[in-house]
């Protein structure tokens, strides 16, 4: 692959632009439901979350092969860690910490106009393997750079992004399982009634559908794609 970036794009307001994160799109059009669901998930993650983290200067992950880095800064910071599982997140955390601790103004960008096509896991076994790797890598990296957590010196990355990752990524499976167990236990002993549970579950489901539709619509508009009825049904489902 050949990627051409204008030299002037690496400097803006005297800040070193360390890296670019490209938007990636699943290709070809997935036939399995497992892969189709990831199309929506990727749109929600990259069209929404990365835009938001861009605004607050808190991007913590440049997705693997879909990023470009300033070579000299990467070398000065120590390069890739050979023992890192989530090497993409580890490098971004390392670069951010290095620049902040050495007083180097920097910027990490997500650029949606740069597009890279990729393939998603087509079955649950491959998806489980991928997500296990992501989860272990995130836990390893957050532990390695725990000095940044809630530390105002590291800006929004330490004060906001990392706490969000801990609450909604690392601890989310445990919280959800404990929540389900608590609801079942509460229903079984009569401590809670079924109606509030159904209302909250329905509200959560509707919010998820709405978020998916918004993300999907944004992706469709940006690519000027033609939609089929079954595509919209997959998104809602």
Predicted segment positions?
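Membrane-embedded segments
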Residues: 1-4, 9-10
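A short, conserved alpha-helix in the catalytic core of glycosyltransferases
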Residues: 73-76, 84-109
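Catalytic core and acceptor-binding pocket of nucleotide-sugar-dependent glycosyltransferases
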Residues: 66, 87-90, 94, 163, ...
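Membrane-embedded multi-pass helical conduit in multi-pass membrane proteins
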Residues: 164-237
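Membrane-water interface at loop-to-transmembrane-helix junctions
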Residues: 153-168
């Amino acid at each position: 692959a050949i990627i051409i970036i204008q030299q002037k794009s690496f400097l803006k307001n005297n800040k070193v632009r360390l890296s670019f994160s490209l938007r990636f799109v699943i290709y070809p059009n997935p036939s399995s439901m497992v892969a189709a669901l990831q199309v929506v998930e990727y749109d929600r993650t990259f069209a929404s979350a990365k835009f938001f983290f861009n605004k607050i200067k808190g991007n913590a992950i440049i997705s693997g092969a879909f990023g470009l880095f300033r070579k000299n800064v990467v070398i000065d910071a120590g390069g890739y860690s050979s023992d890192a599982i989530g090497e993409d997140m580890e490098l971004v955390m390392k670069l951010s910490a290095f620049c902040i601790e050495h007083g180097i103004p920097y910027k990490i960008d997500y650029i949606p106009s740069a597009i890279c096509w990729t393939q998603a896991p087509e079955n649950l076994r491959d998806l489980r393997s991928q997500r296990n790797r992501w989860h272990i890598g995130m836990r390893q990296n957050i532990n390695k750079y725990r000095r940044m957590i809630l530390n105002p010196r590291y800006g929004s990355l330490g004060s906001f992004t990392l706490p969000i990752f801990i609450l909604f990524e690392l601890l989310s499976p445990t919280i959800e399982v404990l929540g389900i167990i608590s609801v079942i236990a509460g229903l079984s002993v009569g401590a809670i009634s079924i109606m509030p549970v159904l209302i909250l579950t329905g509200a959560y489901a509707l919010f998820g559908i709405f978020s998916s539709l918004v993300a999907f619509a944004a992706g469709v508009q940006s690519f000027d794609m033609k939609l089929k009825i079954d595509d919209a049904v997959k998104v809602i489902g």
